[in-house]
Design a protein with these regions (language model features):
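N-terminal membrane-targeting/anchoring modules of bacterial envelope and secretion proteins
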Residues: 1-220, 224-225, 234, 238
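C-terminal structured domains
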Residues: 232, 236, 249-270
Length: 270
């Protein structure tokens, strides 16, 4: 696989080329064919995704409802789409190692049930696992089926808060794949041209870095609500909303912190 800088191509075209190697058409076709006939395990095998969970054990430990929700998600999981969108690192575009990424959360009944998460894991950097991905369940400490006293074999077994694919189902769930275009801001982006001049009113994005700034407030609201830190509708740039701060990563050494404010009820309804 060529490095991202070997041929002098742009960053965008380089990442597209990386994915052509990492998720070839043959993988997409095989995984899709298996998924469409209900063979989610076969789809995972075609996309080189290992399954480290047992639905019968899930039903016994967390209840039938949790197992049914998990089964429905697995039936609609597009493992090739998941592989396409997982975080990668330069210069060779390999999967970022040692990650545990949440895909979905379930809440079994019972006072001590806790939360159960479907997660995707990438192998540690030292493991001879190639570019394989694994699916597993993570139950928080103190919950039924939670981690035991022994160290977990994965270096970072807890879901990583930096990569919330449970809030971005369009990156792995075939039922939500159509949401990619509006969630990425493409619906209001001029075809083949630069972003609209009014999309960055605060002037926070460096020149030449095309970002869908007009989506930041809405995406921040989704994240803040999921973490229980939102109290209203996000939509402003001014300071003053306690707990409404969000950091946006613009590059390896560049971040901007935004603080959102709720839109007044009268304005939000107009």
């Amino acid at each position: 696989m060529h490095s991202l800088t070997a041929t002098g191509d742009t960053r965008r075209s380089s990442w597209l080329r990386v994915r052509e190697f990492a998720v070839p058409p043959s993988m997409i076709e095989s995984a899709t064919a298996r998924r469409q006939v209900g063979d989610w395990a076969g789809a995972c095998a075609a996309a080189r995704v290992d399954v480290d969970l047992n639905l019968r054990s899930v039903a016994a430990t967390h209840g039938r409802q949790c197992a049914a929700q998990l089964r429905a998600d697995l039936r609609h999981l597009a493992p090739d789409l998941l592989r396409w969108h997982l975080p990668r690192i330069a210069p060779d575009g390999l999967l970022r190692p040692g990650l545990t990424i949440p895909l979905a959360s379930y809440h079994p009944a019972g006072p001590d049930a806790g939360g159960v998460h479907l997660v995707a894991r990438t192998a540690p950097a030292w493991a001879a696992a190639g570019q394989r991905i694994s699916l597993a369940l993570w139950a928080g400490p103190g919950s039924r089926g939670g981690p035991g006293p022994h160290p977990h074999p994965h270096p970072h077994p807890r879901p990583d808060r930096r990569f919330r694919l449970d809030l971005h189902r369009h990156l792995w769930d075939a039922r939500s794949a159509g949401d990619l275009r509006p969630r990425s801001g493409a619906d209001s982006w001029p075809a083949g041209g630069p972003p609209p001049a009014d999309q960055d009113p605060a002037g926070v994005v460096p020149a030449g870095l095309d970002c869908a700034v007009h989506r930041w407030a809405a995406e921040a609201e989704i994240l803040l609500r999921a973490e229980g830190r939102a109290e209203g509708r996000a939509g402003g740039w001014a300071d003053g909303w306690a707990g409404g701060a969000m950091a946006v990563r613009l590059g390896p050494r560049s971040r901007v912190v935004l603080r959102l404010t709720p839109v007044p009820a009268a304005e939000a309804g107009s």
